[in-house]
Amino acid sequence: MNLDEFSDFNIDQLLGPSAPLQDALVAPYKQVSLPRSNQDVYAKRSRLAERIAQNDELIRQVKQLQAQNKQLADLQRTAQEVTDLYQKEKQQRIELEKRTKQIGERCGQLEKELDVQVGNCENLQEQLQVRGLPVEAKDVLSILMQFSQRLGDDCGLLRRDQNIMKKLREHCKTIDVSVPTPKSPNSRSKRKAHQPGVNQSTQTDEEPADPKPALCSVAVQVEGLIETRNQATQHKNTTTTRGTTTASFIKHHDVGTCFPEPKPLPNIRQILDEMLSWRDDVVIEPMSPLSDLQQELQLEDVPTNASVATCTTLCDIHREIDFVTDLPTQIKVSASRPPSRTMLDSVKEEARSSRELAKELFNFLPQNQSCLTNLPPQAFEELWQVFGQMVLALLQRRSNPSMATPPSVSQADFTRWLYELYEGTENQTEQTSNGSTSKRDFATSTECMDTGTDPIIQSPNISHEGHVTPIRLPSKPKERKRKSKKRKAAATPKPIAKRKCLEMETNNELEVEREQTPETAIQFLSNLETFNMANCDNLEMELDEEELYLLQLTSNAKQNENKGNVRVQDPDDLKSPAQTSKFPKSENHLPAVLKETASSLKGYDEKQCPFPDKTEELMHKKTFEIQENIGSLTELPPNIDISAYPVSMAEVRIVSSNKPSEMEVNASEGTDSHLDKSVSNLDTGSMSLFGSDSDVESEYSIEQMAPELSDSDDTFDNSEEDCRSADEPSNSKKIRNSSLFGSESESDESEERALEADDLTEAEAKVEEKESEQKSSDVAPAASSGKLLVVEADLVTKTQPLFVEKLDLENTQHTSTCTNPKETDESEDEHGLVIDEQIFISQPEEPPLTVPIAAKRRRTQSELKTLSPPGEVRLTRQRAKQLLDEQKSGPEKGLSLVEQIRRQLKKAINKSEPFKKDSTHDSKKDSTHDLKPLEHEDELKAMQLGTNFEPIKLSCSISEESPASPPACEPMDELDPPPIEIPLEQAACTRKDDQHKSIVQHVLKMDTGLEKLVEANRKTLGKSQPQLCASIGKYLQENMQLESTCSDLAMDIYKVTKSEAVIVNAMITVICKIGLDDGPVERLLNALKYLNFSQRFLAELEERLFRNTKERPATELALNYVRLYLKATALQATMSAGYENPARLLLAKILYHFDQDMPPLVMEVLRQFPTALPHREQREYDNSDALITVIKHLLMNRQYDMQDPNGAERLLLSKLRFEYHFQPYEPSKQQVLENLVGKLKAGREEELGYAFALFCRRSPHLKVVESVVGEHLMPLATSYCDLAAQNELYDARLGLLLHCISLVLKPLPLDTDISAFVGFLKRLLVAVPRSGVQLAAVKASLRLQRFGFKYTLDALKDYRPNYELDPLTRAMIRCFAKRRRHFRHVAATGRRTEI
């Protein structure tokens, strides 16, 4: 390249430093000719190229700045135009407002003027009506007179018209009106008036007709045999009320009328008698002869006054008792005492007055009702009196449990008295009634009683001068009649049982045993004490061949022992139904008392059999309990003699009642039947009351099931502690939003374990002590005649039932210290064991001893505890331990459990001597269990108390003379006491242990035995915590994001711990230290998604934000929590469907819990989720959520600090005003309240409780108790309560309303008076027995415990549910008991412990 061409350029100067630009222009330079220099031309060229490139870049930037400057100028101009337009529009609006105001004032003036003009117009119209007449009044008179003169005098006016004309003339003279002179008469103008003609008619008599002879058809017309009744008949209505038995009388009064009474049609014999009685000389006349009309009109009008007098001192009568109403009515409870002490302590449910219950109650009545018909009048009067007393006691039992007293007469005495009363007067001759009597029931008169008898009329009055005649019992019972075979077969069909027993008796003897006495209403009432159940469908117990044989074996124990010729069948034929049958889960959960009664009734008879019989599986419901109890023989130890444990449960009850300090052994003495129902439903997956209620178990794995079994069995060795520690990770997934502002309860699993351990330790210690006492005692144990009394209420602490389908001991594993569920059963529902104590059986060989009747123990309500539902076989803890020991050291472990039991029973049958010696020997020899007899223990306790208790013969669940009981071994003459009076009023004194404890009292009692409180769930690991945080921090700071990194993180974390709570807590701590950059947060969300921890992550963030009410987190830390929450919320929304607007709910919680730091947190939520609140112009937005109105009201009625231009409060208000276009102070609190109440009345449940709570807590200048609760919520609750008492359509709304009221009252000051609401809750628990309303009322009362535990205890003292509680209610009750125990501990020691 030739450089001569560039001689005019100074290259050195071009490559030198450039001069600074001035106004983005390059300064010109002068060309100077320089000598040519030999330099590096290529280097200069490159520098020149770089300088040119820089210049081009500068030129481009200049152009870009010029374009931006132009845009900025345009924007400024546009902004100025917008500002001018805004000012112009504002000025126009001000002018328009002024003009509008002026126009409005002008309109007001015009309206006033218009009113004046309207009034004037109306006056003018009235004047026009007066003045607009054609002539004046004076002229009218003259014109009228002129017209009369023109007509003339002979115009045919009537006398009335002439009198009027005369009066007009006189009036004209009076007022000086000139009357024109009459004109001359004109003959042509006269008109003749029409004269009325006279009509004449004659009336003649009708032509007389020949009389016709009276005819009648002999074959058709007969005299109706209708007896008439005079209304003067005396009627008597005996009414039994609470406290009094009264009789009301209607006095004789004659109303002068007789009316026919409906009678059945005459039979053929009566018609023939009437026809043959006719004679020729008798003139047959019609039945209704023609009567004269005048005679009928002249009948006397006899007054129909009735004089009614009632001789009574009624005591609070609220309802008729001699009929069942069609519709259920509200039962008003009286404070008066019940009328009789013969009522039953075991009655705990109020009789429901519904048609369905009436049908069930009266199913026991025979169809022909011949028994009641044949009763003589006096017997009917006394029985009707007793019936009223019993029904009233049923109605009073639930409402006034403190008035219950023990019955003064036993059930057997009452039964004997009834049969004596019935049979003693059965053969009396029936008297015919007079013509004025009638039957009570026209429809069934031909079936129920003979014609012409009325037992009510013939019976004497039971009331003498206002005093009630007492009922005296006879000294000895008479022989009862047996029910015929034909009638029994027609009454109740029974299932065909294909069973074989050992050497049964002849069929004739079996037929005698199977005969039963007719079941009547009186027998049903006498057995109410035993059959304490809501549904009485199976009252008439039918026994099949096997059951009858079992009863016969028991009753003839001595005879079998003396004969010694009992043959044993082949062992292959002895198959237990528990081995061959599968028990289906019962979906029809019967009431607790029904299940207990049915099970004890049949199990009592069957467990007396020395061995199980071969039976085929029967799935029918009536025999299902029999199969269950036969299968329950598998609960007995396989290597223990069946007679080793004789015990009299009566003595156990008497001793336990005299020594209250031993009640801790029987931990569930006061447990109500509802508690077993509330924890027995395994299908729902819910845990027991003291289980983990706030945690949701995702699946039942081997890791989770083994600790549960080990927790239940506290008699194992100390190695089970490892299993308990492994149970902590199971508390993983908390239910989100279980309460609005924090959790209602904490998990309390170790509390149950400690309680069960204490109970079992005390029980074992006492049993061991009594074994040593038994060895030193020479008194031979005496038992009743083979009556097995397994009263679970005395010896049972209930947890979850265990379904047993088949026991297989060959598959057990001996290496595990914590038993696997497969070791005890192979069923699907494997949970904890049920019974904490041993099961004792009585010795069936010894004869019963006679005792006075006063020593008989009555059946207390605490015995009425529920057994397993049909199809469930439950194992005791003692039995579980025996199974485990048998696996280790049992010599017969190769055999099945049923086969071992069968061999033991065969040995017991073949023995010819009593089992007492062998039982003592076996109990000493067997070291694997601690089953000991209790009779020596009872005798020693009786000696210490100075009382000698003898074995008592009891009726377990039926009367001693009922058809299903075995025949007595000895005559009952020695047991007959002198006649006992049955008083008609109860005494005021009651035993404390006769009453059911409420569920709250039971929970409090169960908690009293714990010495230490449950420590809080730990969320850190201690020494391993840094390692866990390092693993998480390393993962969050990695640059590479792969799927494998999440799996590596999971492996590293699970090496340290598997606790979800610990891992999530560490994640939050680490991410807050690292910072919320996009990379770490994204990796954290990926890890949460991979580990499926997002739900726990949100719960932990909420706990850190809102749980600690005294110390809130700092503003920056709270902002980090909110940002993380919103990120995780977006992740959760993508993972789960139906997750609607969680940001709005977070916004409500922030407003509820934060006051000073609220603006930055709300600002952060609205930045990330701007759709949490709607814009004012956004019409398509869903505004149905009640939280929207409340949040807008709270945000726009707050006083903001506008001093700091960059402050969060100023920015938040600007965002609300200019982005969402919210108006200041809108909506008002009245509008919000009306909106919330309207949604409540409409039944919309979307976050309504949250909205009420937030509104009443943060709304300024709001009178919560007076305006919100007093004026709106409580009246609405009262009306809903009345509606819910009638039907269940308003249950959901009433429950929601109680939820809202409790959340509103919860944060109020402690001096607030809430007694009115607590009283309403008490009324509601009684008035509405349905579970939905009652659970809402219970939760509402538990939320108000911060005002004092007395309010909650007072509201729930009578709450005894018979349904299963939901997990939240159980958790709240457990938390209430824990807090109460905590504060009592603080009050006693002065030291605070962590709850």
UniProtKB/Swiss-Prot annotation:
Molecular function via GO: chromatin binding
Basic residues composition-biased segments: 478-489
GTP-binding recorded as keyword: no
Keyword list, A-Z: Coiled coil, Nucleus, Transcription, Transcription regulation
Domain of life: Eukaryota
Biased composition (Acidic residues): 710-720, 745-762
Region (Disordered): 175-212, 452-496, 561-588, 658-680, 707-786, 841-872, 908-936
GO CC terms of this entry: euchromatin; super elongation complex; transcription elongation factor complex
Biased composition (Basic and acidic residues): 721-731, 763-776, 913-936
GO biological process, one term: snRNA transcription by RNA polymerase II
Keyword Transcription in record: yes
Principal location: nucleus
Regions annotated as coiled coil: 748-778
Compartments, record wording: Nucleus
Protein's job: Component of the little elongation complex (LEC), a complex required to regulate small nuclear RNA (snRNA) gene transcription by RNA polymerase II and III. Specifically acts as a scaffold protein that promotes the LEC complex formation and recruitment and RNA polymerase II occupancy at snRNA genes in subnuclear bodies.
Family designation: Belongs to the ICE1 family.
Oligomer status and interactors: Component of the little elongation complex (LEC), at least composed of Ell, Eaf, Ice1 and Ice2.
UniProt protein name: Little elongation complex subunit 1
Organism: Drosophila melanogaster (Fruit fly)
